[in-house]
Amino acid sequence: MTKSVFTDRYHLFTQMLIQERCDKELTQVQLAEKLQKPQSYVSKYENGERRLDIVEFLEIADCIGIDAAEFIKKLQA
């Protein structure tokens, strides 16, 4: 059995981030510009090609305009 670093909870985490981005009517390009990263950065974490660390998550939450603590509470619910 192969182990994956991408658990069901991590998949939910990325799906919630995508939903938050879409709720704020931000495209991947617009978010990438706010992050000062290429669009492929956003695409890769949204598609599970790369994993985010906590600092990256906090930067993304800031740029999307969401409260990181509230987001984590929703993820834990």
PLM feature spans:
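A short, Lys/Arg-rich alpha-helix, primarily the initiator
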Residues: 1-23
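Short, charged recognition helix plus adjacent turn
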Residues: 1-7, 70-77
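Short basic helix-loop element that most often maps to the first helix and adjoining turn
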Residues: 15-34, 59
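Key DNA-contact positions within bacterial/archaeal DNA-binding proteins
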Residues: 29, 40, 69
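DNA major-groove recognition helix of helix-turn-helix/homeodomain DNA-binding modules
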Residues: 55-70
